[in-house]
């Protein structure tokens, strides 16, 4: 049970700088990661996820209570997560109240996914939901960043508490192609009027997410 008032300095600065309210431990980390990486995540209290969790795109006609305590009527084709055939998450927009995290949540299921913009477009407007996740998914999120985001989530949690058990399930359907370009450090120095050696150049670009292989660099998809 984490006290949402006690975080590391970088998290505290995030809430202070953006003038945001704290919710609970896992939700706060999820919100921070969306800000830091641009990739929304969603946290389920795993003790409330009992049964078959399935993602589907289907015509729905049912009432859905969001984690914002708002009931909406799903009346058209939606991308949803179902638990035992009941909608628990309007994918890419908002999660459901029945599986949401609280200050008492000790075990969490983290969803880090890619949704095509056309599948999310207009949903928050139709259902009158102010959603940071839908705002990002509508504008495209890099499908290659999931591993990095999950590792970062784990790191932030471990900065604040001990982790007992971790398991990762991954399904890759779509990724952006990684492009490589040739780089000549001497030519870069000549053009820029700099004096950067190859070790410095490699160090700088690696920190920015580039992969270096001799005189080739791989451009990060983000």
Feature map (PLM): residue ranges:
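RNA/tRNA-interacting regions in translation and RNA-turnover enzymes
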Residues: 1-222
């Amino acid at each position: 049970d984490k006290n949402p008032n006690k975080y590391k300095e970088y998290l505290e600065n995030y809430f202070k700088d953006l003038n945001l309210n704290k919710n609970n431990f896992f939700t706060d980390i999820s919100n921070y990661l969306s800000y830091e990486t641009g990739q929304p995540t969603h946290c389920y209290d795993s003790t409330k996820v009992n049964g078959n969790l399935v993602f589907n795109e289907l015509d729905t006609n049912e009432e859905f209570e969001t984690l914002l305590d708002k009931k909406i009527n799903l009346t058209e084709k939606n991308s949803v997560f179902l638990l035992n055939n009941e909608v628990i998450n309007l994918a890419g927009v908002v999660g459901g109240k029945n599986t949401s995290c609280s200050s008492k949540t000790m075990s969490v299921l983290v969803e880090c996914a890619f949704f095509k913009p056309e599948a999310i477009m207009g949903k928050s407007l139709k259902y009158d939901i102010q959603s940071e996740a839908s705002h990002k998914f509508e504008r495209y999120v890099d499908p290659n960043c999931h591993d990095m985001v999950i590792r970062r989530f784990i790191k932030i949690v471990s900065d604040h508490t001990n982790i007992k058990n971790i398991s990762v399930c991954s399904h890759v359907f779509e990724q952006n192609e990684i492009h490589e370009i040739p780089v000549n450090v001497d030519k870069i120095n000549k053009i820029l009027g700099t004096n950067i050696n190859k070790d410095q150049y490699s160090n700088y670009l690696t920190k920015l997410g580039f992969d270096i292989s001799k005189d080739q660099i791989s451009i990060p998809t983000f």
